[in-house]
Amino acid sequence: MKSIKVAAAVICDGDRILSCQRSYGEFKDGWEFPGGKLEPGETAEQAAVRELREELGVTIGSLEHLCTVEYDYDTFHLSMECFTCEIVAGTIEERVHENMAWLDVAHLWDVDWLPADVEVVKQLEQRLAGEGRARAFKDCAQVKSS
């Protein structure tokens, strides 16, 4: 089975999380965290920086590892490194996605997450249950206006 490595970013604004709806391909209309495939020789961190610049038009600062998701789709295995990050420059633009939405923690399941991204949402929920809202989001980046 083919294996694909991707990097994804969880971007927060207070207790809201940015979700993006795919606009193309097999998973069109599914919701995901922004990010994409690693290029040859690229680390997951480098891919996250590049993908957020390309997809959202923003520059990010330091990355904090959140989780790694291993998920078997019908035709490939996905290995997804997920990070929280801080936007240090730029304003989020809708460049490649059908739609984007800020979801507060009470409405995380209001969109139809892609299966691998469901695992990330579950990790966020566990973090909330174990640490409480304030501590769970302490490492989650805030959107900074430029």
Positions of predicted regions on the chain:
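Short connector loops at helix/strand junctions that flank enzyme active sites
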Residues: 4, 12, 28, 33, ...
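Nudix hydrolase/Nudix homology domain
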Residues: 26-31, 93-146
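Active-site-adjacent beta-strand/loop module that shapes the phosphate/pyrophosphate-binding cleft
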Residues: 69-91, 101, 105, 124
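Conserved N-terminal beta-strand and adjoining loop/helix that marks the start
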Residues: 1-17
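A short coil-to-beta-strand element that immediately follows conserved catalytic motifs
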Residues: 58-68
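Conserved Nudix-box catalytic region and its N-terminal flanking loop in Nudix hydrolases
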Residues: 13-54
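Structural detector for helix-capping/boundary residues
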Residues: 15, 36, 50, 63, ...
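Short clusters of small/polar residues that mark proteolytic maturation junctions
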Residues: 22, 70, 96-97
